[in-house]
Amino acid sequence: MLEPEYLEKFSDQLLALVDALSTAIIADMSKRLVKTGEITETSRRQAEILQGAGLLYKDVLKRVSQVSGYMNTEVERVFEEAGVRNLKNEAVIYKAAGEKEIKLHQSETMQKILAANVRKTKEEINNLTLTTAVKTQSAYITACNKAMMKVQTGAFSYDKAIADAIKEAAVQGTEVLYPSGHVDKLDVAVRRAVLTGVNQSAAEMNLQYVKESGCDHVETTAHSGARPTHAVWQGKVFCVSGKDSRYPPFYESTGYGTGAGLCGWNCRHNFHAFFPGISAPAYSQEMLDDYSARKYEYNGKKYTEYELSQMQRSQERKIRATKRKLTGYDAGIKNTDSNTLKAELTNRFESESAELKKQEKSLKKFCRQTGRRYESARTQVHAVLDSEGNIVGFNKSVAQKAVWASKRHTSKMQMVK
């Protein structure tokens, strides 16, 4: 069994790597945008845009290759960690019932289950990540064409049009393309893949444990903030075979094995062995009712844990979007030869830095008032590049620049007043 709290945070380091890849790709796109130059002839402009798009496509593939090794290693690590943790948690229940303990490194069957899920998840993440090259190339062409139209109509100067293009590309972020045609943000896709993969791996291990021990009952985990369709079966005992009429059937009741059910897409519920007459239920009805109660107050209103979690995620997404814009502006400042464009981008960088400070202050206040934990792991990581522009590590350089830029912006505003 894997605890919901563990499943919420176990992939943070992997997602930090994904965020670093995203910001590196945005920086590459920004570099290409500021190098386009002012060409008024449409045919020449289109030729240059397509050439830049081709080079950017290669840039993205290079970035993916630089980070994929880190990501694959991290995927292997989290699966191994989760597998050991899962079986240790199960062992406590089995030993209490007089059953033998199964350890991951002593069970060939459990190791095969883990290895198969690691392989499947790595392939899914690698395939999805590669599609970012196509989506980024498309976003670049769209951004260039919009900038060209703005300049040609006389509505915007070249500098403002390019700065807008960088902003739009950064806000859109890196996206992946599923075979079905569905488009998602890269970090969302990776989180879904690794959470689902790890949880399903643990679930398969637990069912194998049940099979080997002869246990026929399981209890699902429960957590506050569960989606309504999952809240109806969380924290309850089920019969795996469906033969014990005292308990509802496991598969039919929880939807296990389907994307929308237990251990499906983005699900943080798991389950553990339960021995009637020996095991004590982990959750009382009072506890389950409390999980879905509107007991949290914020700005004079009552909210459930689920509602607060969605509010926090929304604020965190805005912070990441702002940091992507800062990355784009920063790359543009470093790579443009135009003093006027550099001035435009610098002004925007300072203004956006002040906005970032407000957003982070607002999120900290929200977490303080609602008793939630302020998550900063993902918002602090950025790629470190060597002299040739290759990703060789991670640091907080852009974040620190934003702090100083925010101070400069505040000073300017005070002078205006």
Predicted regions mapped to residue ranges:
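Contiguous, non-catalytic segments that form substrate-binding/exosite surfaces or channel walls
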Residues: I125-S213
